[in-house]
Amino acid sequence: MTDVAPSGALPQPSAEPPPLIGRVVATERLPSTPHAFHFWTRLDAPIGIGTIVRVASPIPVAGALPQVCGVVTEGQGYSDLQSPLHDVLAQDGNPDAARAATERTEIRLYTAQVLRQLPEEPLQPVPLGPVYLATEQDVAVALRMDGYLAPGRRTAIPVGVYRAGGLQVPVHLDADFLVGPEAAHLAISGVSGLATKTSAILFLLQSLFAHFPASRGRVAAVCFNVKGPDLCFLDQPGALEEGDRALYDQLGVPAAPFPAVHYFAPYTARGVTLNTLRTHPDLAHNVTPLTWGLPEVLQYAEVLLSKEDLDAKADALIDFIRERVVGRRFEDAGLSRPHEVQSFADLEAWFRDVLRTLEEGGREQWRTHHAATLRKVRNRLGNLSTRCAGLVTDDGALSDLPFGAFEDRAVYVVDVARVEEDAQDLVFARVVSRLREHLERRDLGVDHVVVFVDELNKYAPADGPDTYVRKMLLDIAERGRYLGLVLFGAQQFRSQVHRRVVGNAGTSVFGRMDGEELATPGYQGLSPAVKARLATLDKGQLLVRHPHFAQPVFVRFPRPAVMAGREGVERFPPPPEPTWQQAVARDLRRLDPSIELGWVTEVSALHDEAEALSARNAVLRQRPDDVRAAFLRALARRARPAAVDAEGVAPRP
């Protein structure tokens, strides 16, 4: 056995010899090969599926004694009986009868897949020899962790511990193969509720933040919360048992919640409160509205419009609007006035002016664009702010993630669990695209970003149409590691995710699996015994496949040191929806504690709800020193210009 070494350090051998547990056997029917071998053990040997063992050959090869490490993948037990009938006759057909005069010999025979051979050349069949239970140093060598645990390298990221025969050894992933540049991405699969997929990702992020070498740059995480309150309380401490705390200590990871977490969520359709379960007043300090206007949405119109909507003519008109109309002053001799299109309301006024020009002139085309195409695109684009109400604003207001100012070791949670599917797709597409753009320019604020997406089969399904989001995920999976854009994806059924997405994941993790899923072709490399263990894994247990591991290995990880979603909702219940006056006063009070409900009610008495909420949003984005004056100015700007008629078109002179 060896003394336990702290995570990130090479284990040191002790003088105590490892326990001898069996011997390699090879027959014509069960021969040893360079990649597999068989061995028998005592009946009481602490061996099971997933145990790592070492074979020591007494015969030198190329001047060195071969050492072979393997992991048990199958087990058998049998006796010298030729037929079950013989045992029945020996007991006179009665299981309770006196025992036979001679106790039958029973054997335990195991099959192991080779993890590593030393020396690695020449590669030969596993020799006959004694089999030992692996020590801590043996585990590090078998999984090739000695290379990235060595002094001067130290790119090891703890993922959990390997347990067998009373031994508990930290298992590490190589950061160069987890977040790049050698390989990247992680895919975790397992049945819902039992596989602890989200918990495993959260612990791995904590481990990554604690152990990622400073020499490799700055790292942050962007997590999309797509269901329930799973990720809503990452900055709150969770209850940990002593066993979990001991694992944190051994793995060198702080048993504490994430120190820097920033939340972003769109408003509800009404716009009074944020559409998230994290609305308790005690948690509002780090929650920022997520709202986009016309310029931000138009760039990703393909996400929200179907292929029937985006024919060649409509696509050409949208490109014209994006490049020539939005964000600049547009003048045309036939229009009633110059247009400065900054919002959906401005775009609607522009469309009405163009169509009125065609009707008054009796024409069917405007600048090569047919009137039918104009009406079609107008209807489709004008509907976006309604379909994504709360996220997409009519007034062009922008409140976004801090692209260009990301913090090292910070977590940015985008909560879209309560918004419609179209809005979820838009948020995912735009946020990830913006991350890529900034990483390409090297001005995001960090060098690596881990993007965590649950329900990956929804965004990159194995079957179905080739959507904008799926194409984007494929591109990230195949080229993201060169940019520092890393995908951590979770899904219940790995077989339902596009094979190029999971195939490009350098690390694959499996929690408790469904039997039908294990029967799919993607798991044919696993032995029946490993599949059987996968189908019965407890919470906190995982099977990890990594580029350095010749075979996947079972590990156990501690529960995350953050508050679970269900517990968080009980402790910080969302308050009832307030009136719009109460909502404005509450939000402005975050910037100026002296603001009272009576003052807000008084100054907004001549304004409707939409104008007051829009003014509030503007103040929250600006964060001015004089909140009262800024709110009054914003209210005044919300008044509709008198020179524009009800249809948004100025009267002709």
Regions found by a protein language model. Give the residues of each.
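Glycine-rich phosphate-binding loop of nucleotide-binding enzymes
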Residues: 163-262, 499, 544
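Conserved P-loop NTPase catalytic core
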Residues: 245-276, 503-524, 535-538
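Short secondary-structure boundary/capping segments
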Residues: 88-89, 235-249, 278-281, 466-469, ...
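Conserved P-loop NTPase motor module
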Residues: 539-653
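P-loop NTPase motor domains
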Residues: 212, 216-219, 223-224, 228-234, ...
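Phosphate-binding and hydrolysis-coupling loops of NTP-dependent motor/remodeling domains
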Residues: 2-15, 52-57, 107-123, 130, ...
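Conserved ATP-driven motor cores of ASCE-family P-loop NTPases powering translocation/secretion/packaging/pilus
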Residues: 468-469, 474-561
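Conserved ASCE P-loop ATPase motor domains encompassing nucleic-acid-directed helicases/translocases
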Residues: 2-151
